């Protein structure tokens, strides 16, 4: 799915967003997206695709690679917050730097928080049982990232 983000992933993200918008009590112009790992990528892609109504996007230890083949349109109608584990071996420094460059090129309102000592999946207490190396829970990073997220959402939807 992530290898075909324009062909397979984008329509699924749009379908999920449209399902949310169909709920009567939802303000269709004040939507947010957040996710963990691949869900973090999906959240960032909601901003990159400039889906109508998305105002706040949060990624927790998400994949940061840009979408190939789409123009670098301005992202001036939403805010982005990224929580990254500084010891995350699944996302290289080159990829982190490329993400920063992409966000600057798009004139994005973004916050990038690098949690020291935190590895990939730092929010998941069960991650110690996951086979890949470089994955692990970090209570401090989990607590701090969630606290920052709540403040970010208050600001975005004030």
From Swiss-Prot:
UniProt-listed Pfam families: DLH (PF01738)
Gene Ontology molecular function, alphabetical: hydrolase activity
Entries under PANTHER family matching the protein: DIENELACTONE HYDROLASE DOMAIN-CONTAINING PROTEIN, DIENELACTONE HYDROLASE DOMAIN-CONTAINING PROTEIN-RELATED
Protein name listed in UniProt: Uncharacterized protein K02A2.1
Source organism: Caenorhabditis elegans
């Amino acid at each position: 799915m992530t290898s075909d983000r324009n062909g397979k992933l984008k329509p699924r993200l749009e379908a999920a967003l449209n399902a949310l918008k169909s709920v009567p009590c939802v303000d269709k112009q004040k939507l947010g997206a957040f996710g963990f790992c691949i869900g973090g990528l999906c959240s960032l892609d909601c901003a990159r695709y400039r889906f109508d109504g998305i105002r706040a996007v949060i990624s927790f230890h998400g994949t940061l690679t840009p979408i190939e083949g789409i123009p670098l349109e301005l992202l001036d109608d939403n805010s982005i917050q990224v929580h990254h584990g500084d010891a995350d071996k699944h996302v290289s420094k080159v990829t982190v730097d490329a993400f920063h460059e992409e966000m600057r090129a798009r004139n994005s309102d973004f916050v990038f928080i690098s949690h020291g000592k935190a590895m990939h999946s730092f929010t998941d207490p069960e991650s110690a049982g996951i086979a890949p190396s470089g994955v692990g829970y970090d209570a401090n990073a989990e607590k701090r990232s969630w606290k920052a997220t709540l403040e970010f959402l208050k600001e975005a939807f004030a």
